[in-house]
Amino acid sequence: MITALLQCNPVTGDIRGNVEKISQAVRDAVARSPQVNLCVTPELALSGVNPGDYLSMNDFVEGCRKGLDTLAERFKDGPELLVGAPVESVYNASLLSNAAVHVHGGGWDVVSRKIRPKSSRDPEARFFDRGVSCGILTVEGWRLGVVLCESDTEAEFWTVQGTDHNPLLDLIARGVDGLVYMTAVPYTMGSRAETEAVLTHVAARHHVHLLSVNAVGGNDGLVYSGQSLALDPTGAVYARGRAFEEDVLVVDMAEGSAPVADVSGCWEEGVLGALTLGTRDFVHKCGVSRAVLALSGGMDSALVLAIAVDALGADNVTAVLMPSPYSSRGSVDDSVELADNLGVKYVVVPIEPMMQAFAGAMKPCLDLFETYEGDFTFENIQARIRGTLISSLANRARALVLNTGNKSEGAVGYSTLYGDAVGALGVIADLTKTQVYQVAEWYNKAKGRTVIPRAIFEKAPSAELRPGQKDSDTIPPYDELDPIIEAVISAESRVPAGNLGPRAEEVRTRIFRAEFKRRQEPQPLFVSQRPFGRAWSVPLAGRFRLPE
């Protein structure tokens, strides 16, 4: 039996466009193998992943139904399709089902409805029913169990949390030749290797063929890596979809032979692939083609510029250098060298005249209050001047601003709202400063040349908002700060702050106090297991204070 795994990159909400994308993938599969019997999409391929409150709109749900009708008519003579789509629930009239829809013979019917635990982590859980069981589809004499299920943990794969119900064991007991796992699992560092190990175990333990079809593409802050899989009953992977690209994987379960794609060799490569795809899709799915960013001469903006060029092309990226009287000559020179290496157009706009104009214009209101030790007013004005300039350029260029802040800065609030915190997308907002340097080193190695100048690696990190300033004047050195941040926000650890070093309590307090900034900063691209903005929340107006 020949099956095509359609590793699609849908645009959420664009049902018309997604119908065409699925249709083209089916045609590509048929062109490669005219005998293809079944084509399978990822979960929610018709609507797009994470549709949110689109699901509350009747015309959107009706549009999904019409999309299925179109596919049924278009492929009434074959091949058969399994399409991930939202459909009306048969259990609760006020809800929908996240379903696997069998399209065949000019019509369609629901095979499986996604099973989820009561305490689902899925933000769309309020729109969907919990499902009951996974269905079996028979194609060319093969009995295929069709699985959509939110797993509790990888160790309890496909076990519904809080119950003894295991959809996988239910299917095995009913007798199947293979499993088709339709999914949309967001990328996080290291997660894909873990998932592949679990799938290998499942196929080998139950001696069944296993086809896993995963979504690919960026959707707001989430990135889906693709890397769909075909495994034989021994657990051997005999076909693997490309990472971070659309792909059509045609496999013959009877023979179990197909080319196997290369596997990512290191976490830095995976992160770079995710951030590049996430940036490209965020910009393009917002209906824009260009991006602008502030280039400071530091590592954060250097890496974001490199990612932007890979994602959008050098012709669609503009860098702005905005030196102040406190900027070093090296910062400007290093920025120019980087822009030239990447072939990016840039402009240099000194901000000293604007700093002087702001200081004069603001004097009457600032004089109402006395200054104080640690008064950052004029340092923040520099950042806000830069934020105004880069935002204005984005207006004129019809572009999006790419923010260059990292997770370490975001954790402790080392940024200026409406200044260096402006932007549409936080490209590296889920990478610590340590990780930023590691990914940048890998980037240069992968390119086979020194694109990011060595001087940027070697200089001490600094916002250059006052003479001789270094980041470590205000916050702990990053090699000390980053482990504390990871420990504080880790879901697994409840490590007493005192066990994390002498500055741990200070860092934890800053993390809590900076929540109001993080809530106003650009959408991050999520790549870690525990990102701010998705898996973390503390009160804005709280005060974390323990009894003595």
What are the functions of these language-model segments?
Residues G13, H207, P233, P259-S296, ...:
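ATP/NTP-dependent adenylation/nucleotidyl-transfer catalytic domains that generate, transfer
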Residues M1-A294, L305-A314, L321, Y346, ...:
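Enzyme catalytic cores with a strong preference for nitrogen-chemistry domains
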